[in-house]
Structures are given as C-alpha cells and as structure tokens.
Curated annotation (Swiss-Prot):
Biased composition range(s): Polar residues: 682-694, 761-791, 804-813
Region (Disordered): 664-694, 756-813
Descriptive protein name: Kinesin-like protein KIN-8B
Organism: Arabidopsis thaliana
Domain Kinesin motor: 14-345
Gene: KIN8B
One GO CC term, this protein: microtubule
C-alpha cells in the first residue's frame, strides 16, 4: 500500500476568470461593440442603432455590463494575459494542481490564446517556459521529473495525440489519482523545447476543418497535461504537481456555418459537450447561492476530465474569448454570461505530498503496464502474421469475425453507458435524499419558531429553495430514466441482431456460445457496479461512525458522560470494546448475577482463513443438552455478515440496564408435533425508548439498519420475562473493535403483536438471515446466502421475504 502523509489544511479559493477580446478582422464588415474599462469591466453595446428616440429615453436597450478578475482589450497580447495568472502556474512546482482552459464561440481566438504563434506565443508555451525556468533556478538539492501527455476528445471519443495510430481510450476512476485515461502515453521530458515539439506533433494530428465562420476551426477538445514530481534528496518525501492546459472547440450554429454531412455531426457533438460544461458551471454557481445542487459531470467525457479543475483540488483559470463584431453579439453575451457564473465556483486546493513508497509503487505500476503492453504487442504481431497467410476463401470468415467484433464493441458500449446512467441516477437520488432531510429539519424549525416572523420568513425562503432543487433533480431523474429505457431498447436491438446471426449462419453452436458469453459479461459488469456502490456506502457509514466517536473524544468528553447524556435523550450507545473482558470467555460468563439457571454460555470465535465466526458453548455451563453451534459467515465479496443456525429465530428481548437498552434472548415456544405450526412468542409490552423491530426477526427498523444479535435456546421450555427490570442475559454483538460504536435512536409507541411462523416439510433445514448496508438504497437487492431462501430490503424500512423449496411462510402483524 502506498504511504501518504497527512495533507496540509485545504484552502478554499474561487475560479479566476479573465476575458480577452480579439481584434476585429478585415472580413468582418461591422462595428466594434465591445469596450474594456479599467482592465476589469466589459461593456457590450447594443448592436441595433436604428432604435427610435422613445426606446432610448425609456432605457430599452440590449447593452450589457460585466465585471471580472481581469479583462483585456484587442490591443493586449498573450503575454499580458499570462502575467495575470503566472502565480497559478508557478505553484505546480511546489506540489499544487492547476488548470487553465479557454472558453468561447468558434472563431473567437481560443486556440490562438492557448497555442499562439512564434511572434506571440500562447499560454501553453509560456507556462512550459516558466516551469522549466523555475526548475533550473531552484537552488535546493531536490530532484525533479517532468512528464507530458496530450489527448483530444473528438465526437465523445478520446484519442492520444502523441501516438501515430491511437485507438479509442477509456476513462477510469482511480481512488488515489481521480479521473485518469487508461492507456494514455506519458513521455518524460527535460526541456520546454521538447514539449513544444510534442505539442506541434500533436497539433498536426488534431482534427481541424475549414468553415464559413473560421478557416481553421478546431473540431475537437485538446488537453495538454504536465506532471511535475519533486523529490527531496535527504528526505523520504515526494511532491506532485499537475498542470492541465485545455483548448476547447468552439460552439457554432448550423445556420451560420452552413455545414453539412460530417461537419454538421461534428458541430452537434461539440455543442453537446459544451452544453454539458455549461450545465456544470450553472450548477456549481448555484451552490454558492442556493445550496446543494446536483452537478451532471457524467453527461460528457469532457466534463469528467475537467471535474477536478471545476470543483476539486486545483487552482483554475478560465479565459473567456470573445469577438467584438456586432454580428457576434449573441455569442459574446452567452460567453460572458457563463464566465460571470463561473466566478462563483469554489475549489479546495492542497499540496500533494507522498512518501518514497508512493514513488516506488509508481515505478512498479509502470513496469506492470509495460509488461502488459509487450504482451498485447506480441498478440497483435501473431495476429498480423496469421493474416498474411490467409487464403482467399477464408476472407469471408474474416469479414464475419470483423462484424462480430464490431457488434461486441457495441454491446460493451451499451453496458458502459447503462452503468454511467445508473451511477448518475444513484448520485442524483443521494443528493435528493439529503435535500429532503434538510427540508424536514426546516419544517421542524418553522414549527418551533412560529411566533418569530423574521425567522419564519428566512426559513420559508430557504425551504422554497430546497423545494426548487428537489423539483429540478426529479426532472433530471426522469430524463435519466428515459435514457435508461432507450439504452434497454438498444440492448434488445443488439440481441435481435445476434439471434438473427445465429439463425442465418451455419455455425450456430459457435455463435450461440459467443452470444451467451457476451450476455454473461454484461451481467457480470452490472453486478460489479452494484457491489462497488454497496461497498462505497458501507465505507461511508463506517467513516461517519468513526468521525463521530473521534469528535466526542477530541472534545474531551468521557464515555460515561456520553452514556448518561444519551440515556436521558432515549438514545442507546453500545460500546463494543467491552465484548471480551477476559480471553476465552463470553461476556455473559463474566456477569453471573444475570445468568438464568438453564441457559448455556455461548461464545464466538473468528476464523480468518474461512472468514467465519464459529460459536461455541461452555461445557461448564448448567444444562444437559447441546444445541447445534451456529456460525456467523462473512462473504468476502459482499462485506456483509450472515448468522447461520439450525433453528428458527426467536425474538430478541430487551432490558434496561445502567448502560441503556441491551438485547437478551428468549427461547421460542414450540409445538413440535408433526404437521402442527410452531409458535414464536414476541413481547407484548415494549417501552417507548426501546428500538423497534421490523417485520423480520433479525432487523431493527431504524435509519441505521444495524444488525442485532438474535439467538435461540436449545431448550423447548420457554422462560417468560418482563421487558423492564428483567434479569435476562445481555447479548453482545458478534464482532467488535475498540472504536466501534452503534447509535440507535428509535421509538415504539404500540405493543408488538404476536407473530406466527408456519413450516411445512423438513424442520431442521439450515436457514440464513442477514442484513445489508444497502437497505436504504432503492433498487438494490440484498440476498442472504443459504438454502433456497433470501431476503430483500427496500427503502423506507420493512422487509420482504421470499423462500423457495421449503414452502416456509411468515405472517406478521
């Protein structure tokens, strides 16, 4: 595992927005309508000069005024623009991230600003010179390493501009590095001239076309990334900085460019990705004024690449380029409108500091990637050699295989799109859940402050904002559902194509196997996605518990004070650190005053090799019968715990002790005559402060859905006890850690009715009951692995049980 030092405190900063107006070109027959005042204010005049006197005196004009961090007129050069952001570029050498991107319509001067010419070099060239000048002038003994990569996004497909024949590249999410492009070539460089050579090489491979709006229009988005590693010679420390320079393609209108065919499709894809970027800027800008809002990063690959630059760990500069011509009034105003909203976006920056272990792990990763690349090249070479010796009559088979490969690629893209849509829908629902929680808190606050009009008005205003966000998110969710339905229709079409190929081709066995393989691959990918989502939720819940406990300890609050205060509020806190006071003995063994005479002592041990908790009974306990030992099983790939036993579960009894409410077990009353129903006794009196159980025998109906220990006695005679004051044996959780704390806050105002359990067939078949951390997630199922039985949990509490094979039915009131 790489070793990472605790990062320094995060610093919150806003986007730096600069506006550059290009000069008026000779072919533009019109007047200049843009004015730059005091290097900060931009005024766009009304392009219509024919308005009558009444319109002018009534101030009905299209004139617009904006203020930005920096504003540059037509006479400014790229060096003037660069001086305003040079401090951001220099911070890359000291372990910080920086992003610079140009935004504007086609022909407004984005590529000129970023790349420039020999006489007026652009921001990319000037940034590279600054980085290497700082490395050369550094007087410390630190070692520097600079790498460069260059990619383009063309028609929502990523290509490597440093590779002669680059294939399609995919985006991946790395837990340490964030969004990365799999297979992107990164070249080690030692001077700015070398990077300029690579930049010119990449620009020669970049997609450009001539349109009526721009003679050299960029048809793709380009991202030049410079990574700087700084290693201190006498210390075990590495700092990593990253500079991303982005040249976006310009938005365009089909009516103005008169494009057709491929150019028209390219323009549509460019506008689509820029619209996704504009929506992200709008959502991020709203968060400063209206609070929590969903940001649709997944709508485009461009926005996913720029995610860190827009809201992550990066200092970001946005250069908005505009045209002064009156014919470009609408494009100019739209660009300035989005630039004005971008001023509200905030990012959180911190130094990227690691240790030498991280440095060495990067080399190991590079070695693994090179070995994988060598293996792929060998495979491709073998395929090429076999193709050279192919016979003419086999070319038909080759065409069929090529068609199958293309169909396979479409299936993979269909599955990946579905996963992305499901992820986006999941994030949207999570955002709405937090909004509804805040809405509930606002309603409670309004009810408490009914007499304070000013406070109620402020809370009501905030409540309306939250309702608007919920409504917007619901509309976005409907759109995602529609996209998922269209994706499913496309999947059915692909399936029909495969079935048709199977019916029309003579080699039906091979095609049928291929079809099944692709379908299994699709199902496996979706299952991996569901598992990843559930693991993420488990991790978030555990982090929340750990942070809560660390917060209490950091404030100097003692555990006894926490327990006393929680007991007064009706909250139960179980400290799992007191599970085993003495090794080898269960907790109940060490409290003899609470032990009934005929209940054996049961302990639990964990086997790391088999990933199971094995229960055992103390042979010195009173009693003459031995019950089958239950087992607590953990499925490695599900990270969930399942309690396995031979008997049906009895209810969990609760008692009130000095530590609050704890669980106790009572045996179920049973009538074991053949064919008769078994009866399970549930408590008839429950205190209001005790947690409420859900309809299943092993579930709490609380927001946390924590699993409570549920055991049965091997003896047939029931012991009747009271809830309050009964001296029942305390039951501790199966697994414990010194810092693990479970907080439950539940209430139950009505008595629980008796529950009947009827069985048919075999009595002692093994059954499994379990819970999942995903019980609150819509559409995600939880299966307990046992003999023909499983349990599903749904949002809002409650369970739905299904059983197969043993005809078991449960009825609960």
């Amino acid at each position: 595992m790489p070793s990472i030092r605790a990062p320094a405190a995060k610093k919150t900063t806003t986007l730096t927005v600069a506006v550059k107006c290009r000069p008026l070109m000779e072919k533009e027959r019109g007047r200049d309508i843009v004015r730059v005042n005091n290097s900060k204010e931009v005024v766009v005049l009304d392009p219509d000069l024919s308005k009558d006197y009444l319109d002018r005196i009534q101030n009905r004009t299209k004139e617009k005024k904006y203020c930005f961090d920096h504003a540059f007129g037509p006479e400014s050069t790229n060096k003037n623009v660069y001086r305003s952001m040079s401090s951001v570029i220099s911070s890359v050498v000291h372990g910080l991230n920086a992003t610079v991107f140009a935004y504007g319509s086609t022909g407004s001067g984005k590529t000129y600003t970023m790349v420039g010419t020999r006489s007026d070099p652009g921001l990319m060239v000037l940034s590279l010179n600054t980085i290497f000048d700082m490395i050369k002038s550094d007087k410390s003994s630190d070692e520097f390493e600079v790498t460069c990569s260059y990619l383009e996004v063309y028609n929502e497909v990523i290509y490597d501009l440093l590779e002669k024949s680059s294939g399609h590249l995919e985006l991946r999410e790395d837990p340490e590095q964030g969004i990365v492009v799999a297979g992107l070539r990164s070249i080690k460089v030692h001077s700015a001239d070398r990077i300029l050579e690579l930049l010119n090489l990449g620009n020669s491979r970049r997609k450009t076309e001539s349109t009526e709006m721009n003679g050299t229009s960029s048809r793709s988005h380009a991202v030049l990334e410079i990574a700087v590693k700084r290693r201190q010679k006498n210390q075990n420390q590495v700092m990593r900085g990253k500079l991303a320079l982005v040249d976006l393609a310009g938005s365009e209108r089909a009516a103005e460019t008169n494009n057709g065919g491929q150019k028209l499709r390219d323009g549509a894809n460019i506008n689509r990705s820029l619209l996704a970027l504009a929506n992200c800027i709008n959502a991020l800008g709203k968060q400063h004024k209206k609070g929590l809002a969903y940001v649709p990063y997944r709508n485009s690959k461009l926005t996913r690449i720029l995610k860190d630059g827009l809201s992550g760990n990066s200092q970001t500069v946005m250069v908005a380029t505009i045209s002064p011509a009156d014919s470009q009034y609408h494009h100019t105003v739209n660009t300035l409108k989005y630039a004005d909203r971008a001023k509200e976006i905030k990012t959180h920056i911190q130094k990227n500091i690691g240790t030498i272990d991280t440095h060495m792990s990067d080399y190991q990763r590079m070695i693994d990637n090179l070995q994988s690349e060598v293996s792929q090249l060998k495979t491709q070479l073998a395929e090429k050699e076999s193709q050279l010796s192919i016979k003419p009559f086999e070319r038909g088979v080759e065409r069929e295989l090529s068609w199958l490969d293309g169909l396979s690629h479409q299936i993979s893209e269909n599955v990946q799109d579905r996963i992305n849509l499901q992820k986006a829908l999941f994030e949207l629902e999570e955002t709405n859940l937090r909004n509804r929680t805040e809405l509930q808190h606002l309603d409670d606050a309004i009810a408490k402050q009914a007499t304070e009009k000013d406070v109620v008005e402020a809370l009501s205003s905030r409540r309306q904002v939250i309702l608007d966000n919920i409504r917007d998110n619901d509309e976005a969710g409907v759109n995602y559902q529609r996209d998922i339905e269209e994706n499913e229709k496309h999947r059915c079409e692909l399936q029909d194509m495969l079935n048709e190929a199977i019916n029309n081709n003579g080699n039906k066995t091979y095609l049928h196997i291929l079809n099944q393989y692709k379908l299994l691959g699709m199902g496996n990918t979706e299952l991996q996605f569901e598992m990843a989502m559930r693991d993420q939720i488990i991790y978030n819940q555990r982090e929340a518990q750990r942070n809560l406990w660390n917060l209490l300890m950091g404030l100097g609050v003692e555990e006894k004070q926490v327990f006393d205060l929680a007991a007064k509020q009706g909250i139960t806190i179980e400290d799992w650190s007191s599970i085993a006071l003495f090794p080898g003995l269960p907790y109940r063994k060490q409290t003899p005053s609470f032990i009934p005479a005929n209940i054996p002592f049961v302990g639990h041990s964990y086997s790391k090799s088999s990933c199971t908790f094995q229960s055992y009974q103390d042979p010195s306990s009173k009693g003459q019968q031995w019950a089958p030992t239950p087992t607590l099983c953990r499925e490695e790939h599900h990270s969930s715990y399942y309690f396995m036993r031979q008997e049906p579960p009895a209810f969990v009894n609760l008692r009130k002790s000095h530590d609050g409410w704890v669980g106790g077990s009572r045996p179920a009353s049973r009538i074991d005559t053949g064919g008769n129903h078994r009866r399970v006794s549930y408590p008839q009196t429950v205190n209001n402060s005790s947690p409420r159980m859900a309809s299943g025998p092993t579930f709490y109906q609380t927001p946390q859905r924590e699993m409570l220990l549920n055991t049965t006695s091997p003896y047939s005679s029931p012991r009747v006890g009271l809830i309050n004051g009964a001296t029942t044996p305390s039951v501790q959780p199966f697994y414990g850690s010194p810092r693990a704390v479970t907080v439950r806050n539940g209430s139950y105002n009505t008595p629980l009715a008796p529950a009947a359990v009827s069985t048919k067939g075999a009595r002692n078949q093994q059954r499994v009951f379990g819970t999942s951390p995903l019980s609150g997630t819509k559409g995600v199922k939880n299966s307990s692995y046992g003999q023909n039985s499983h349990t599903k949990l749904y949002r809002g509490g409650g369970t739905k049980g299904h059983s197969k094979g043993n005809n078991t039915q449960r009825q609960h009131q």
